[in-house]
Regions:
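Membrane-embedded alpha-helical bundles that constitute the cytochrome b-like, heme-associated redox core
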Residues: 1-213
Length: 213
């Protein structure tokens, strides 16, 4: 069954590729290697600062296009991510064991409670990174620049482990999430068993709404 349509998958791929480049070049610069080209800078033949700035602009434009052209999807994403249900605490309490056993507590959302928390924190974190990054590009020194630089760094410290965790889960390496990577790759089609394990109510709705053969 199809979890994500083609447009969603391509948007997701474009976002994570730009974010990964930004994280790689950003951490290279944070580590004090501004005078030494990173492998990415060498590949593209440009300084890390220039590459970081250019890809940052690309991410900002990409998000703007996504919001404008995908208003319905954005609305669904926001509504589903901000929805809290009484059983969410129980789901979260069972999650650490479930990632190895696959025995997740039941939930009735489009996203599971862990995804919803991650969505909110990651979107806020990326928004802070993009906003402060644009400010750093437009300003040249001064107290505001110093504050933006500090916030940009701290947002990087927060967002990096979240993205690393997301990649770990989405890769399907953990037993409980085996097969989940197909939701965003190779046509976005999930094995029905995987869908029922991770998003039981969504899978049930999909089966109910599917037209008969």
């Amino acid at each position: 069954m199809e979890r994500n349509d083609r447009r969603t998958r391509w948007f997701h791929a474009a976002v994570y590729l730009t974010v990964l480049v930004l994280l790689a070049t950003g951490w290279w610069l944070i580590a004090g290697n501004e005078g030494t080209p990173s492998p990415l800078a060498t590949l593209f033949g440009t300084p890390d600062t220039t590459l970081h700035r250019g890809v940052g602009w690309a991410l900002a434009v990409l998000v703007l296009i996504g919001v404008v052209l995908g208003r319905k999807g954005v609305r669904t994403f926001v509504v589903e991510s901000l929805r809290w249900r009484p059983g969410d605490a129980r789901w979260l309490a069972r999650w650490p064991r479930a990632v190895f056993t696959g025995r997740f507590a039941h939930h009735d959302g489009h996203f599971d409670p862990g995804q919803r928390l991650l969505n909110v924190v990651m979107v806020v974190g990326l928004a802070v990174l993009v906003g402060t990054g644009l400010g750093l590009v437009l300003l040249h020194g001064g107290p505001v620049f110093a504050v933006l630089d500090r916030v940009h760094r701290w947002a990087t410290y927060v967002v990096t482990p979240l993205i690393a965790g997301h990649v770990l889960v989405a890769s399907g390496v953990l037993p409980g999430y085996r097969g989940v990577w197909r939701s965003m790759h190779l046509g976005g089609r999930l094995d029905p068993e995987v869908a029922r394990r991770l998003w039981p109510a969504w899978a049930e709705r999909e089966n109910r709404d599917r037209p008969p053969d």
